[in-house]
């Protein structure tokens, strides 16, 4: 009974030692009697207990935080720089057998190459060229760690800190630049405002002039229309008179009567002296005849028509 129990316990220990589980992000390097045997994927792995051993390798992306260090730039300025490195294992065999302490190895390698890269740059270039420094450092580290079975995914510079006096000088310079930029923007805004105002005044003057011109044109058109209407009316009136005279065949008595009405309008009741041509005596004679016809026979001796005739003045020849 005791022997059977011992056999069961031995079998359980052998089963526990022979079965290994690798997670999805892991790979394993199997060694047999201290010698590389094979590389296994994630899942359940069976090994020979006490003869074979397995070393697990994490295949996920990992981070190395490089400690801050002082670096001298090309113009002999001391700056404090630190960075982080993101890497992943691509070859478990090289990662296990080609480097003892990968974390310490890549840290020292990053610090050394960071000093070399920044040592070729001046302070201004160092402060404004982070992306370039990241790219160069990643390429150098990726090439150097290739034999370790790793790939450097990216490098990020976290801090570039110049000395305090330089920081103060840079702060003053930045403040002056901001004030200069603000003054330029203010002047540019005032300039644009004045341009817009001038354009608005110009447009208003143009619209006002166009409005006045349009009003003058409309007044002129109205006067023109009125004059044309008056002229057309007068023309029609004259045409009607001539037509009536032509159709009615007026006598000298009617003409003389109309002549008398015209003289009355000309005189207009004022003390006016009218000079008549010699040819008008015939018409006045007709008027006298009309007056005798219209007057009462008893009054013929009382009324008189005085006429004054005077030859028409002829213009002097010069």
Curated annotation (Swiss-Prot):
It comes from the Archaea. The chain crosses the membrane at residues 2-22. InterPro entries: Band7/mec-2_domain, Band_7, Band_7/SPFH_dom_sf, Band_7/stomatin-like_CS, Stomatin_HflK_fam. CDD domains: SPFH_paraslipin (cd08829). It is a single-pass membrane protein. GO terms for cellular component: membrane. Gene3D superfamilies: Band 7 domain. Residues 295-318 are annotated as: Disordered. Keywords: Membrane, Transmembrane, Transmembrane helix. The keyword Ribonucleoprotein does not apply. It is found in: Membrane. It holds the Pfam family Band_7. The keyword Membrane applies. Belongs to the band 7/mec-2 family. This is Uncharacterized protein MTH_692. It comes from Methanothermobacter thermautotrophicus (strain ATCC 29096 / DSM 1053 / JCM 10044 / NBRC 100330 / Delta H) (Methanobacterium thermoautotrophicum).
